[in-house]
Every structure is written in structure tokens, then in C-alpha cells.
């Protein structure tokens, strides 16, 4: 288990949410901060995608009705993350793969990070015996051109810096920063 006391670094503030949806979003935001901490510690790159990215850009947080978070990693970083995260997560979180949860059958998505203190039913999976806490989906990216990837990333960073925020040190979800000032590499 983790040697970092995430309960102090990123306290569980789910009860501060005024609605069930907001409580779920606060849980996922805490989970994302912990994922970010682990990724930074181990030099693992990731990026937000889908509605998560749209919410961060358009709403400076979650899309108001959004109930999930999605991130991507290139395959090499994804494989390292899966290997490392199992031992880094606090007790109230888990890495859900077919190896860590034999009842997990959400294919083709090979990995989720789950909150173990919550419960969510996904349509069509009510009878499954797998863990069912709130989750963050992690999508491994397999097809990319190695020589074009740095160029594409550089373009994304320029767009990000120009239109979204002044620095890649933090992404703000309302008043919550994903990149913690408390974190030291």
C-alpha cells in the first residue's frame, strides 16, 4: 500500500457536495489528484479526454451533468501505471483490471480506477460481481506515430497555453487544482 498519506494530502470531501452528482464529482476529482500525484512521481504522462477535457475547458470543471472522468496514456506509460499504481493507491481506491478483479468484464476498456467507498450501477452490469464504485476510465493509446507524437504534443501544449490557461502546472476544476502546490517531485 501507499506510503503517502493521501487522506491528509487530498482529504475525502464527498460530503461537501450539495447533490449526489456533486458528491460523485468530488470523489472523482480526489481520485484524479491521486492519479496525478502518482503519475508525476513516476514521470508518467497522461491527458484528459472526451467530456472530461470538454468540461475542464468549457466549464472550468465538470460538465454539470457529467458523472465520469476519462484519461488517456500512451501504451508504455499505461503499462507502467498499471504496474505501479496497485501499490501506490490508498486503501479506499483500487485499480480494476481483469487481473485485479476476476469478475471485471468491461471490455474493451482494460482499466478503471475505482473508489471503494461508493457504489454505482452501470446499465447492463447490474448482475456482475465486480467492484462497482465510482470510477475513472483509463484508455491506453496504441496507435501513434513516434516521430509525430512530440510535434502533436507540442501543438496541443501551445493551444492549451494560449486558450485554456497560462501554465501547465495546474488545471482548475472551479476552485480545486489538479496539480497540487504541496506535491514535490
Across the structure, where does each feature detected by a protein language model lie?
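Conserved oxyanion/phosphate-binding beta-strand-loop segments in alpha/beta enzyme cores
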Residues: 1-4
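Tryptophan-centered motif/residue detector
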Residues: 10, 47, 65, 139-140
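Intrinsically disordered, low-complexity acidic/polar segments
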Residues: 80, 147-148
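Active-site nucleotide-donor binding segment shared across nucleotidyl transfer reactions
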Residues: 36-69, 78-79
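Generic detector of well-ordered alpha-helical segments enriched in charged/polar residues
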Residues: 154-157, 161
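A short secondary-structure junction signal
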Residues: 148-154
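Conserved catalytic core of two-metal-ion nucleotidyltransferases
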Residues: 6, 12-40, 85-146, 162-180, ...
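Short hydrophobic/aromatic beta-strand micro-patches
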Residues: 72-74
